[in-house]
Amino acid sequence: MIRRIAVSAIAAIAVAALNAPGAAQAQADDRTVLSGVKELKVAFDIVEGDAKGLLNRLNVIDETRASLIKQGVTPQFVIAFRGPATKLVQTDMSKVKPEDRELAGKIAARIRELSKAPGVNGIEQCSVAIRQQETKAENVLPEIKVIGNSWISLMAYQSKGYAYIQP
């Protein structure tokens, strides 16, 4: 009887551990879907104008990049900024909402890290968005290349086999 209770208790603890927060994440992998895949090319179209949301997207892009590498897949990422995100990837803080200024520094730091990370082939800023958001090309973070038109760039990447993701 005591042995049955002990076995039941151990089983209950094991089930609880498997269902604990983070347990599924620790066991999750993408082996099945990545079977036979050696490289993934993705163009991320970033328009998020909320600093917290933009920083979150950049963090998840980096997490995805690192996860692919860990699973033996070479990422080829391009990150393209346009729309309201434009104000958060430049240095003129008068263009950034006061409540977003602290996070703008964290965004700049994350972009610096991403620009040096294996698997990130380019980070771009649309000049059409610069004009529409009333910012200046010379204020774009130095790690970001100012291009003519992100739509044209994104179309070109897709024609070269890049998947399109707008997180």
What feature does the model see in each segment?
Residues 10-11, 64:
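Enrichment for repetitive, rod-forming helical segments
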Residues 15-23:
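C-terminal segment of classical bacterial N-terminal signal peptides
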Residues 1-10:
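Bacterial N-terminal signal peptides that target proteins for export
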